Every structure is written in structure tokens, then in C-alpha cells.
Regions:
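Substrate-gating cap/lid alpha-helix
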Residues: 166-204
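Short amphipathic alpha-helices and their capping/turn segments at secondary-structure boundaries
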Residues: 29-39, 101-113, 143-152
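Serine-esterase "nucleophile elbow" of acetyl-processing enzymes
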Residues: 29-90, 109-110
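Structural recognition of the beta-strand scaffold that forms the well-ordered cores
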Residues: 40-42, 88-92, 115-119, 157-160, ...
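Oxyanion-hole/transition-state-stabilizing segment in secreted/luminal serine hydrolases
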Residues: 98-139, 163-164
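Histidine-centered active-site loop/cap adjacent to the catalytic His
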Residues: 185-189, 198-201, 216-239
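A structural motif corresponding to the C-terminal end of an alpha-helix
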Residues: 78-86, 146-156, 188-203
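N-terminal secretory signal peptides and thylakoid transit peptides that target proteins
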Residues: 1-17
Length: 239
């Protein structure tokens, strides 16, 4: 069957927009430079959820994804956004212990590549592990193992628990002998190190913060604005 010239022109007009229109995927690839977006997840305690402890409301996850160039010009162009498309899913909660981690993954949906940051153990020490003689530490290890095994994100970057006394026993603020506290802090960090070898990498906040000063902290134990940036400094090269 032969088509009239007029009908052929009409069909060509209909087809032209379809040919010219890029696919949704093509448009997304163009917007991201061809790189698929990935997600930075944060889990754990106030080391990662410290926005309420500074006037700017910033926490390490935010600074990692998008630096505040006015506050921290040193990190201009060094944030994760500079490497490509990335989003933050912030789930860490101030005050969390290892038993609270399960609630932080409730409703979690993962798609595409991702990296998880985890800081945990400091509140567990404050709530009893600092004076523990063994049983509590085993429960901590078991609970952390359960959480990490179920977490559908790899790698996991585990941050060690820092020491706000800078290793100075005269700054001890607990009613437990400093030697006992330090031994249990070391045990918690050893547990974190073991899981970091298995599931990702270790962010040694403890070692880094020993080289800091009191301006890195507020309210004795919480990261200050500077402290939030220093937490970011430790995690950044591991991502």
C-alpha cells in the first residue's frame, strides 16, 4: 500500500519529538556527568549527630557531603560533592548506645552504591561499660556483631571512641578509677577495630583527638563545631 505524500509528512511530524526526546536515564546521566549517585549513611551517636552542639547546626556527615566553605575554607573543593553526585542519609542519634542501632535501620532502603559511617560505644561506656569486668563487654560485642551482620551496606567505616581527657587522669570525670576506664575504653576500641577489619575500615578518632585541644569539645564530651570538622577530617580520606 502506497502512502500519500501528505500522510508521510504527517507521520514524520509525529515521530520527530520521539526521536529527539532523550530517555529519562540519558537525562539523569547527563545531569550527573554519567556517574550514578551514591549515598553516605551515618549511624550511631553524637559523634556523628552533634549539630545541636554548635550554633551552625552542622554535623560531620553534612560537612563530608558539602563543606561549609565560609566556616572551613581549608576543605573547599575537597568534599564528596566535588567527586560526583552523592546524597546523605543521616540516621545517627545523639545519646545512642549499641542497643539503639537496630531502630536506626528501621525502614532503611538501599539502592545503588553506598558507604556507612558508624560511631558507637561512648555512651555504652558512660552507662556502665567503663566499670565493666567482662560480661558487659561481651554483650556489647554480640550486639554490634548482630547489627553489622544485618546491615546491607558495605563498606562500613567504624570510628573509635575518643578520649575527652586527652589521656590526662586529672581530667577524669567519672566515678571510676582512671586505669579501669582506660582499659575498658581500649577494649571497646579493640572490638571496633576487629569489626572494621571484617566489614570496612577503621577511622581512628581516638588517636586523632589525642592530638587535639579542649576547643574540639563542648559540654565535656561532645564534639564542638571544630570537633565536628575534625571528625570529618578523619573519615574523609577513607571514603
Amino acid at each position: 500500500m502506497r502512502l500519500s505524500i501528505a500522510r508521510r509528512r504527517w507521520l514524520a511530524m509525529l515521530a520527530a519529538p520521539l526521536i529527539a526526546m532523550p530517555s529519562t536515564r540519558s537525562r539523569a546521566d547527563a545531569a550527573t556527568g554519567g556517574n550514578p549517585p551514591w549515598t553516605l549513611f551515618t549511624f550511631g551517636d553524637s559523634i556523628l549527630d552533634c549539630g545541636r552542639y554548635n550554633a551552625h547546626g552542622v554535623h560531620p556527615g553534612q560537612l563530608l557531603v558539602r563543606n561549609d566553605d565560609a566556616l572551613f575554607p581549608e576543605f573547599k573543593g575537597r568534599d564528596l560533592q566535588a567527586r560526583g553526585p552523592v546524597r546523605l542519609e543521616h540516621r545517627a542519634v545523639d545519646g545512642a548506645t549499641v542497643d539503639d542501632l537496630a531502630a536506626q535501620v528501621r525502614g532503611l532502603r538501599t539502592s545503588g552504591p553506598g558507604v556507612a559511617l558508624l560511631t558507637i560505644g561512648g555512651n555504652d561506656l558512660l552507662r556502665g561499660l567503663a566499670r565493666d569486668s567482662g560480661a558487659g563487654m561481651r554483650r556489647f560485642e554480640t550486639a554490634l556483631d548482630r547489627f553489622l551482620t544485618a546491615l546491607p551496606i558495605r563498606p562500613v567505616l567504624l570510628g573509635t571512641v575518643y578520649d575527652p581527657t586527652f589521656g590526662d587522669d586529672t581530667r577524669n570525670f567519672l566515678d571510676v578509677a582512671p586505669a579501669i576506664v582506660r582499659a575498658n575504653l581500649r577494649r571497646v576500641n579493640d572490638i571496633l577495630g576487629t569489626f572494621a577489619q571484617r566489614d570496612g575500615r577503621l577511622a581512628d578518632l581516638h588517636a586523632h583527638f589525642l592530638r587535639g585541644d579542649p576547643s574540639w569539645f563542648t559540654r565535656t564530651i561532645e564534639p564542638s563545631l571544630i570537633g565536628a570538622s575534625e571528625v570529618r577530617r578523619v573519615f574523609l580520606p577513607l571514603i
